[in-house]
């Protein structure tokens, strides 16, 4: 599944903001608009036993250009919340459910 970082209208959002994948399915986050974005999983909102730092980008690491991607594969079932650290305050947050 491919998730856009930034709406086609320039919105600071993940598109779609909430989605479901199968365990082991690759998720590709793709910069859509050229604003600097990243993907950080919230350590308090991932399934028990999952190390959020191992599936997140570094807070300082950014996808700056349109078309740049970050891929992650989640194997533990459950719900994961994530955000873009530069734009979290603007509501750029998302959620993925792994089945």
UniProtKB/Swiss-Prot annotation:
UniProt keyword list: Chloroplast, Copper, Electron transport, Membrane, Metal-binding, Plastid, Thylakoid, Transport
Metal-binding in keyword set: yes
Main location: plastid
Cofactor(s) essential for the protein: Cu(2+)
UniProt keyword Transcription regulation, yes or no: no
GO MF term list: copper ion binding; electron transporter, transferring electrons from cytochrome b6/f complex of photosystem II activity
Binding site for Cu cation: 37, 84, 87, 92
Plastocyanin-like domain span: 1-99
CDD domains reported in the protein's UniProt record: Plastocyanin
Protein's membrane topology: Peripheral membrane protein
Family matches, as InterPro entries: BlueCu_1, BlueCu_1_BS, Copper_blue_Plastocyanin, Cupredoxin, Plastocyanin
Record Pfam families: Copper-bind
Protein localization: Plastid, Chloroplast thylakoid membrane
GO CC field: chloroplast thylakoid lumen; chloroplast thylakoid membrane
Family of this protein: Belongs to the plastocyanin family.
Described function: Participates in electron transfer between P700 and the cytochrome b6-f complex in photosystem I.
Name of the protein in question: Plastocyanin
Source organism of this protein record: Rumex obtusifolius
Gene responsible for this protein: PETE
């Amino acid at each position: 599944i491919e998730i856009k970082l930034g709406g086609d209208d320039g919105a600071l959002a993940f598109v779609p903001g909430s989605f479901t994948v199968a365990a082991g399915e690759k998720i590709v986050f793709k910069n859509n608009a050229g604003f600097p974005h990243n993907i950080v999983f919230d350590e308090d909102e991932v399934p028990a036993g999952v190390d959020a730092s191992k599936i997140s980008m570094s807070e300082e690491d950014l996808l700056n250009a349109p078309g740049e991607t970050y891929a992650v594969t989640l194997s533990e079932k459950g719900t994961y919340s994530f955000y873009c650290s530069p734009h979290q305050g603007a509501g750029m947050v998302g959620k993925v459910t792994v089945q």
